[in-house]
Amino acid sequence: MMNRRSMLALMAGAAVAPRLSFAADKPYRLAFYANVGAELWHYDVNIDTAELTRRGSVKLPASVQYAWPHHSGRALYVVSSNGQAGAGGVHHAAVLRLDHANGDAALLGTPVALPDRPINVCTDIPSKNLLVAFNQPSGVRVFRIKPDMTLGGEIAQGKLDGGVYAHQIRVTNDNHHAILVTRGNDPTPTKAEDPGALKFFDYADGHLSHEYSVAPNHGIGFGPRHLDFHPTRPWVYVSLERESRLFMYRLAQGRLESKAAYDVDTLKDRRDFDPRQLAGAIHVHPNGKFVYVANRADGTEDYQGRKVFKGGENSIAAYSIDQQTGEPRLIQFADTEKIYPRTFHIDPTGSLLVAEHNIPLDVRDGKGIGRVQAGLSVFRIGADGKLTLVRKYDVDVGKDTMFWAGMVAVRA
């Protein structure tokens, strides 16, 4: 049972725990990375002008799925896949060494082959272990991280319930628990809905145990995609992909509460809600005062003999966070002015937000047809948490897609 002293220790640990953005406790070089297929591109970041300058790239064994930095800021762990199951599958976890002098990335060691498509990855808080989530079959595997930051062997786990269609794995700020976010699947004319759940585990030195599920209504109508933690309070913010909603849960006495404390909409207008309208990535601002959720839409309809965008919300929903209760309160919908912002990230100072968009798509343009390119939207974050779109970058993806993008504080 967690007493007052242990709860205070947990919160203190959360306050100093490393995050993906990293606290600005030591000099670092800010780098932005975004993929096109198997190529991971590196961009310099100018926070003052909100500009991204593309420098170079490194090629992974297959299309990038997700990435996560070593807590030192000197390496990046990247999972990749060609998306094919069975014998035709090419799935790997790779380590990239990051050069503090220029931010460039280069392979460190040999990529580790994985049995199935990896959809998400993270390290534990001290970066002693790498946790990899797989969507089908749904589950999680854990690998040792060696002192030289390369990957060691897989850590055997007991029997784990991986739910249906895992989409994210995260370790809590105190390093004592892990949450596997399992989205489930919508019903089809021939198949019933697959339930979603948050799979909560005890976590110790790479070992997952004592799993239990948070699944309202037995997971029906509950399709979580991603979550993020408040930096200093025991609050967990969850984006529900299939429902386009934002839930806030509390961590209490070492457990995730079974009922969300708050449930808010992520959409501006639900009158034309479409199955291809989905909530996506979620990030809490480094200062803990705001939380942001991506809204994605890419549904098409026939127009002049071509498939064109049929409408929907492609935006970042911004919320202020009540610092006493954790309640998220809507303050803005910021249009990304591109299609399908699959991922976005915030720099360590909390000044910039960059959203990545997967593919180009034809759109209605007056009486004709135009085209919105894949690419990046760069926003300035105000002191009030609101976003101002500063510039957009078109990216030629050819037959590939953009799938992941993130900021990393690269350290010497």
Each language-model region and where it sits:
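Beta-rich, blade/repeat-based domains predominating
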Residues: 61-72, 114-126, 160-175, 218-235, ...
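Asp-box/WD-like beta-propeller blade repeats and closely related beta-sheet repeat scaffolds
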Residues: 107-170
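Short loop/turn segments immediately following beta-strands, especially the blade-tip
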Residues: 44-49, 97-103, 144-150, 202-207, ...
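Blade-loop segments of beta-propeller domains
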Residues: 56-123
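N-terminal export signals
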Residues: 6-23
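A short beta-strand motif characteristic of beta-propeller blades
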Residues: 53-58, 107-111, 154-159, 211-217, ...
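Short, solvent-exposed loop/turn segments at conserved positions within beta-propeller repeat blades
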Residues: 36, 85-90, 135-138, 188-196, ...
